[in-house]
Amino acid sequence: MSVKREYPLKMYRNIGIMAHIDAGKTTTTERILFYTGKTHKIGETHDGAATMDWMVQEQERGITITSAATTCIWKDHVINVIDTPGHVDFTVEVERSLRVLDGAVTVLTAKGGVEPQTETVWRQADKYKVPRMAYVNKMDIMGADFFRVVNMMRERLHANAVPIQIPIGAEDTFKGYVDLIRNEAIIYEDDLGTVMDTEEIPEDMKDIAEEYRGAMIEAIVELDEELMMKYLEGEEISVEELDLALRKGVLANKIVPVMCGSSYKNKGVQPMIDAIVKYLPSPLDIPPVKGTHPETGEEVERKASDDEPMSTLAFKIATDPFIGKLAFVRVYSGVMKNGTYVLNPVKGKRERIGRLVKMHANHREEVEELHAGDLGAVVGLKDTITGDTLCDEKEPVILEKMEFPEPVISIAIEPKTKAGQEKMGLSLAKLAEEDPTFRTFTNQETGQTIIEGMGELHLEVIVDRLQREFKVECNVGKPQVAYKETIKKAVKAEGKFVRQSGGRGQYGHCWIEMTPHEGEYEFQNAIVGGAIPKEYIPAIDHGIEEASDSGVIAGYPVINFKVKLYDGSYHDVDSSEMAFKIAGSMAFKNAMSKADPVLLEPVMKVEVVVPEEYMGDVMGDINSRRGRIDGMEATAGAQNIRAFVPLSQMFGYATVLRSRTQGRGNYSMEFDHYEEVPKSIQEEIIGERMK
C-alpha cells in the first residue's frame, strides 16, 4: 500500500551549502537545523560537536568531509540540506552533491570574500547549472566588509551579484540588516537570534539603503519585460512582484541575491532560510532528468512525479558502524518502496531494498517509501556503488554517469602485524566503494599495497579511518607522485612471439602503428584479408592495454596514445589467444621505445594568500620549486599569488609556508594537468625508481 505524500513537490527544496574551508558552512547548516527545530542544542564546530560533521576526523580537524543529507521542515516546506566539503582534496564529494541538489547557498566570509576554493566550487556549480544565492557570513569579525565581497563576486566569479540586504554595523557593532525588498530595518535583540525588531531604516543609513535598493530594483526588473515597462513609466513595483521576478531570475541562473549575517552569533540565518524557500527551485522548477536506455542507448527522460517509473541515483556510499552499508540516494521520479526489488542497470543486477531511512544529521528515521524529490538512504544494497542508478525493472534507465578525476598521489601502506593483511585489504575495498577518487592496488613487483588519492589530506583521512573505524593499525610510506609516461612521435613496430620446442608450439605475430593522441586509449583494427583471424584481435588489444600499465622509461602507466593494428600472421595449429596477447605486448614495448618516450608529472594549480611583506620571499620559494607564476592580485592587506607547480615539489609546503610567513599565509591547490618532466629531473626520478 502506498503512503500518501505528506508535502506536495512544489514545497521541496533540495539545496547544498557550498563554501571555502572555514567560511562557517557547517555552523550555518547547524543553525538552519536549530531554527527548523531539528536540533535542541546548537553544535559548535569549535567544540567538535557539530551535528552535521559526524565522522571523528571531521570533528578533530573542524572540517567537513562526508556530505550528509539532512531533512528539515520550515514554514510547510521540506528542506533537504546536503552538506558539502570545502577542502579541495574532497572536490569529488562536492561534484557528487551538486549532481543531486537543485539549488545552492554559497557561504562567503565577510573578511576573506571570494577565496580560491570558492572559485572552484562556483565553477563546479556553473557546470551543473545550479541556481544559487550567496550569504556573507562572519559579519561580526575584524575586517568584515560586505560591499567588498559583493564586488569580488562580480570580478572573480563573474556573478551578477545583487544585495537584497545590507548590513547595519560591522565587526563588533554588527546588529542587523536593511531588508531592501521590504525597505525596512531588522535589528537583533538577543544572541540566539530569535528576538528581532522591525524598525525604520536608521537616519544615517537612509541614503546608502536608497542607493542599493534602486540598484537592486533595476537589476530585478531587467529580468522581466512587463516589470521593466512598469518601472520605466515610474510606477511602484510591489514586494510580491519583486519576489516573483527575483525567483524567476535565480532559477534561470541570471542573478545571485546576496544576504549577510553571522551564523556563529545567530544573526541573519532565518531570513536566509526564508530566501531558500522563496527563491531557490523545487524539483518541479528544474528540467526533467535525462538518462539513456541500457539496451538501446536512446535518451530517456524522467519527470519529477510519483506517477512516473521509479528512477534514483546513488550519490554516496557510507559505512555506518551499526547497520553496515548505507547508500544515499536522490529519487528523481516514481516511488521507491521498502522490501521491493529494483534494477541496477549499470551493474545489470537486481537489488533488494532492505530498509529506507531519512537522515537527520546524526539520527535516522525509518520510512516505508521515498517519493520523487526525496533524499534518503537505503540499507541492504549489495552491488551498488557511487554514481549507480537504481530503477524500475520494467522501465530501465541509466541516469548520467558522474565523471571523477584521476588520483595524483600515492603512498605504500602495510599493516603492523601479518594478521592484519586480510583485514586491511577488506577495509580498503570498503573505503574505495565509498569514494571513487580513492584507489587501492598491489604493486606486482614489490608486493606492497598502494593507496592513491587526490592529495595528502585525502590519504591522511583514509589512513585515519582505517585505524579508527576498521581498527587496522598500519605503517605508511612517503607520499609518491603519480607519474605517467607517453610518446611524442608516431611509429610502426612488430611483435612476434614464437615457441617451437617440443609439444604444442606458440605463434603470434602482429604489426602496429602507435600514435600520440590526447584522451583515452583507442584501439583500431585495420586488418584486411584475414592476416590475423578475428578471434585473436581482442587478445592483441588486451596485451597492449596490459603492457601500457608499465612504460619503458621507469615502469609508470602510459597515457595519451592510440594504436592501429594493420598486419600480422598466424599459424593454423600453434596460434592461440595467449600467443597473440604476448605478441601485442611485445609490439607495444618495441613501439614505445622508438617513439621518443617521455615522463609526465602532475602539475598543480596553486593559490597562495600572503601578507604583502612576505610576498617576495614566497614568490622566490615558488620559483625554486620549478613553479610558474600565473598572476597575482591584491586583496585586503594581502597578496593572492596564482601559480602552477609540479606536485613533487609541493610535499610539506604547508610547514614551509607557515615558517616563512609566521603562520599568516595559507594556500590551496588542485590538480590541473600533466606536463613533460625536464630531462635532468627525469634522470633523478628514474634513478630513485630503480633503487
From Swiss-Prot:
Gene3D superfamilies: 3.30.230.10, 3.30.70.240, Elongation Factor G (Translational Gtpase), domain 3, P-loop containing nucleotide triphosphate hydrolases, Translation factors. It comes from the Bacteria. One of its GO terms (molecular function) is GTP binding. The keyword Protease does not apply. One of its GO terms (cellular component) is cytoplasm. Keywords: Cytoplasm, Elongation factor, GTP-binding, Nucleotide-binding, Protein biosynthesis. GTP binds at residues 19-26, 83-87, 137-140. Its main location: cytoplasm. GO terms for biological process: ribosome disassembly. It is found in: Cytoplasm. InterPro entries: EFG_II (IPR041095), EFG_III (IPR009022), EFG_III/V (IPR035647), EFG_IV (IPR047872), EFG_V (IPR035649), EFG_V-like (IPR000640), EFTu-like_2 (IPR004161), G_TR_CS (IPR031157). Residues 10-284 form the tr-type G domain. Pfam families: EFG_C, EFG_III, EFG_IV, GTP_EFTU, GTP_EFTU_D2. PANTHER family: RIBOSOME-RELEASING FACTOR 2, MITOCHONDRIAL, TRANSLATION ELONGATION FACTOR G-RELATED. Belongs to the TRAFAC class translation factor GTPase superfamily. Classic translation factor GTPase family. EF-G/EF-2 subfamily. Catalyzes the GTP-dependent ribosomal translocation step during translation elongation. During this step, the ribosome changes from the pre-translocational (PRE) to the post-translocational (POST) state as the newly formed A-site-bound peptidyl-tRNA and P-site-bound deacylated tRNA move to the P and E sites, respectively. Catalyzes the coordinated movement of the two tRNA molecules, the mRNA and conformational changes in the ribosome. This is Elongation factor G. It comes from Clostridium tetani (strain Massachusetts / E88). The lineage of its organism: Bacteria, Bacillati, Bacillota, Clostridia, Eubacteriales.
